[in-house]
A protein has these predicted regions:
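Inhibitory N-terminal propeptides of secreted protease zymogens
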Residues: 1-94
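Loop/turn elements at helix/coil->beta-strand transitions in domains of secreted/extracellular proteins
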Residues: 16-19, 135-139, 158, 190-195, ...
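Substrate-binding/access-modulating region of protease and related hydrolase catalytic domains
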Residues: 180, 199-276, 341
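Extracellular S/T/G-rich loop segment that most often corresponds to the catalytic His/Ser-adjacent loop
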Residues: 143, 271-341
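Acidic-leg catalytic submotif of subtilisin-like serine proteases
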Residues: 117-167, 260, 312
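Active-site-proximal beta-strand/loop segments in catalytic clefts of secreted hydrolases
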Residues: 23, 31-33, 142-145, 197-202, ...
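Protease zymogen maturation seam
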Residues: 54-55, 62-135, 237
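Active-site alpha-helical elements of protease catalytic centers
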Residues: 137, 142, 155-156, 163-198, ...
């Protein structure tokens, strides 16, 4: 359209109560409460739940706006309105979603990529060559959720999500921690049967870790993996820690292998519990040399006599932020925003 017509149309829209955000020869971007649309273009705004595939390849539904008997979904007919000679119609905005890339970024510092660098650093290749890939092993992770990143699809990794009480949105991992940790698991055991128990979380903290762990136990897995804990340096155990201690012991007595993080500089609990496998961290430099990570914890427990942490080690970065392993996370998640390359 000619500039004069665009300007005249924008002024008419403003006069009718619309906010005009941008003007151009093809379209004018506007916004207003639903009742303004319904008044100017005699119609009703309705909602429709439409099946979609979000960026994580997760089938779900999204709420779209439209009008009854629309010739095209989301099109408001301008005929019969004061704008009938100025615009062809109104196209209602639709929700769009971030699409993650299968290819990781390439930061200009020494780092490891999943799965190959982790597999090599942990020396898992000989096991894979023998056909030991986690097939038939049921692992439950208790964490912030699992986002179906295209990385997992491209490598054939499969997982499912179970919500703990209070957790919502099984297709999302708003924090990103659980999704990233699962990539480490798949690097070592690509054929493992993964279930993620999404615990209710607030920022970087799990709100109901006891309930989430109990949910994991109820699924009767072979292994429960938890990369979290709190700082318990000296006895006595807090009331919370005593409850957690009891349910961890119960899980082990049921024949479940329980793995907990040794901590990131603190005296992690349940990571120091005597019944768990406590996982610490070593740093592998670019020449392949290994050294104890100054980011991961190592200590002798003051609560459980003769208990030294950790029992085993994975690969972990160094202080100050341990930015070391390139992991897939949900775009826009807390980990993506604060730790992204």
């Amino acid at each position: 359209s000619e500039p004069q017509l665009v300007n005249a149309t924008a002024e008419k829209l403003r006069a009718e109560g619309f906010n005009v955000f941008s003007e151009g020869p093809i379209s004018i971007t506007i916004a207003a409460p639903p009742e303004v649309y319904e008044r100017v273009f005699p119609t009703n705004i309705i909602t429709q739940e439409i099946p979609i595939i979000k960026g994580g390849l997760y089938p779900t539904k999204a709420t779209f706006l439209s009008v009854p008997n629309a010739e095209i979904s989301g099109l408001i007919d301008a005929s019969g309105s004061s704008l009938t000679n100025l615009i062809e119609g109104v196209a209602i905005n639709e929700p769009v979603y971030n699409t993650a890339s299968v290819t990781p970024p390439k930061p200009n510092y020494w780092h490891l990529n999943v799965p190959d660098d982790i597999c090599q650093g942990i020396n898992a290749h000989p096991l894979h060559d023998q056909g030991i890939t986690g097939s038939g092993v049921k692992v439950v992770m208790v964490d912030t959720g699992w986002y179906r990143h295209p990385f997992f699809e491209s490598h054939g990794y499969q997982g499912k999500v179970v919500l703990d009480g209070g957790a919502v949105n099984p297709e999302l991992d708003e924090n990103g921690h659980g999704t990233g940790e699962s990539a480490n698991l798949f690097a070592i055991a690509p054929n493992v049967e993964l279930t993620m128990v999404k615990a209710k979380s607030k920022k970087s903290a799990l709100v109901n870790s006891v309930g989430a762990f109990k949910k994991a136990v109820s699924l009767n897995p072979d292994i429960i993996s938890c990369s979290w804990g709190d700082d318990q340096r000296d006895p006595p155990l807090s009331a919370f820690a005593k409850v957690m201690s009891a349910i961890v012991s119960d899980a082990v007595n049921r024949g479940i292998i329980v793995v907990f993080s040794a901590g990131n500089g603190g005296w992690s609990f349940p990571g120091q519990h005597p019944d768990v496998i406590s996982a610490g961290g070593v740093y592998m430099s670019s020449d392949g040399k290994l050294e104890a990570s100054d980011y991961a914890s190592g200590f002798r427990s003051r609560i459980f006599p003769q208990r030294t942490v950790p029992d085993v080690c994975g690969l972990v970065g160094r202080l100050p932020r341990a930015t070391y392993i390139m992991l897939p996370v949900q775009p826009g998640s807390l980990m993506d925003v604060t730790r992204g390359a």
